[in-house]
């Protein structure tokens, strides 16, 4: 025998369980919509504890289609409207069924009428096209908020103090006064002839070969390039205050790293060349066959990646200062003093990057990774130098070149 659902009590107010504002909308406590965790999942914080669905009395999960309802009634109402099912609903008991969490699935018509009676809004149910548009709008708003948050975080990041600005200006001027050709390097560079560096003749133990003509061309510019690195360091007060022994160790350790950085920031994607010492534009194979071997690839790749950073003179100068003041060089006496100097440059560097407000996400940590790349280039060159010294005629090496790169750690 079929069980007959209970009848609705006449005169009952289906909105008694909800609190409404004058405009008919459900009030949200404190206007908050954050989530809180319960044993049954996530529920909005504006719900009272154990608040019931206004349709069936089950535990409510949120504010759906203008009413506080459970997930079941929300889904039932949405499907009914989206698929236009309500004209097909019927009731065996004159539309007088009581709807609760036990009987709600027994009569679709009475359940739908209860949804309408408590105030669920049909016009808030979106069809597929509107739902896609809404989802797109939500994503756009989310992206907009993300960008606004990024801008706010950039604005809140500390910028250089007056003392740091002094440090920054000194480093910048030291770089500019020792950086050959300055900003005019493109107009003044000369391309190494294509026939130089294309016919390696001296074999190296690592399998590479060296073109002695190209090597000879590079040695002509290496001495002034080294001298400019030394001059840069001496213009930094923190460096000049160190003992001569520490100055020599730091210079020998960072010289190739700084020269590589100065070449890398003068990478030209149009000609795919690096400009050495501000005057000689060379191709990858020429630099490789001229003695640098695989080190050439590393410097070219660094140049390509740095081109996206759009570094200015100050950032290059501070990067050089950080490389110079490295405490892990063997034999240093004033390690603590050098470490404090590097920390001062790093902090000023970070604050200056904040001041510049680059558009690249995570610009600062990405830039610091280039320090690691340059340290690797320096280590690879030290190993390469040992092979070159054995295989190439000693008279081809300038005295300053030998003085700086001999006895380096590999």
Curated annotation (Swiss-Prot):
Disulphide bonds in the chain: none
Q: Which positions in this protein are listed as binding 3,3',5-triiodo-L-thyronine?
A: 228, 277
For the keyword tRNA-binding, the answer is no
Positions that bind Zn(2+) 2: 91, 97, 107, 110
The role this protein plays is: Nuclear hormone receptor that can act as a repressor or activator of transcription. High affinity receptor for thyroid hormones, including triiodothyronine and thyroxine.
Protein family membership: Belongs to the nuclear hormone receptor family. NR1 subfamily.
List the protein's name. Answer: Thyroid hormone receptor alpha
Q: Which organism is it from?
A: Ovis aries
């Amino acid at each position: 025998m079929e069980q007959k659902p209970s009848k609705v009590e006449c005169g009952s107010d289906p909105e008694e369980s909800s609190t409404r504002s004058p405009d008919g909308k459900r009030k949200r406590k404190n206007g908050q919509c954050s989530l809180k965790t319960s044993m049954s999942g996530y529920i909005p914080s504006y719900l009272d504890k154990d608040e019931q669905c206004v349709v069936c009395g089950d535990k409510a999960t949120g504010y759906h289609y203008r009413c506080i309802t459970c997930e079941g009634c929300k889904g039932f109402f949405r499907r009914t409207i989206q698929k236009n099912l309500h004209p097909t609903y019927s009731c065996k008991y004159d539309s007088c069924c009581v709807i609760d969490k036990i009987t709600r699935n027994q009569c679709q018509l009475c359940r739908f009428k209860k949804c309408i009676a408590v105030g669920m809004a049909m016009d808030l149910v979106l069809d597929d096209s509107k739902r896609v548009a809404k989802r797109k709008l939500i994503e756009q708003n989310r992206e907009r908020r993300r960008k606004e948050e990024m801008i706010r975080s950039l604005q809140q990041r500390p910028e250089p103090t007056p003392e740091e600005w002094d440090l920054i200006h000194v480093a910048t001027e030291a770089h500019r006064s020792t950086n050959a050709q300055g900003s005019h390097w493109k107009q003044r560079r000369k391309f190494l002839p294509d026939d130089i560096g294309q016919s390696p003749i001296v074999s190296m133990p690592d399998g590479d070969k060296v073109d002695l003509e190209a090597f000879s061309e590079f040695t002509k510019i290496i001495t002034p390039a080294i001298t400019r690195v030394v001059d840069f360091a001496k213009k930094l007060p923190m460096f000049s205050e160190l003992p001569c022994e520490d100055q020599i160790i730091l210079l020998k350790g960072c010289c190739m790293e700084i020269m590589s950085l100065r070449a890398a920031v003068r990478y030209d994607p149009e000609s795919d060349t690096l400009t050495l010492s501000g005057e000689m534009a060379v191709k990858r194979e020429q630099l490789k066959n001229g003695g640098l071997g695989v080190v050439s690839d590393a410097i070219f790749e660094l140049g390509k990646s740095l081109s996206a950073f759009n570094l200015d003179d100050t950032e290059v100068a501070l990067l050089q200062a950080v490389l110079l003041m490295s405490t892990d060089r063997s034999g240093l006496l004033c390690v603590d003093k050098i470490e404090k100097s590097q920390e001062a440059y790093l902090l000023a560097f970070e604050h200056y990057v904040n001041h510049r407000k680059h558009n690249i996400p995570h610009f600062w940590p990405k830039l610091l990774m280039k320090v690691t790349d340059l340290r690797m280039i320096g280590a690879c060159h030290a190993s390469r130098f040992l092979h070159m010294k054995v295989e190439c005629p000693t008279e081809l090496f300038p005295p300053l070149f030998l003085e700086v790169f001999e006895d380096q750690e590999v």
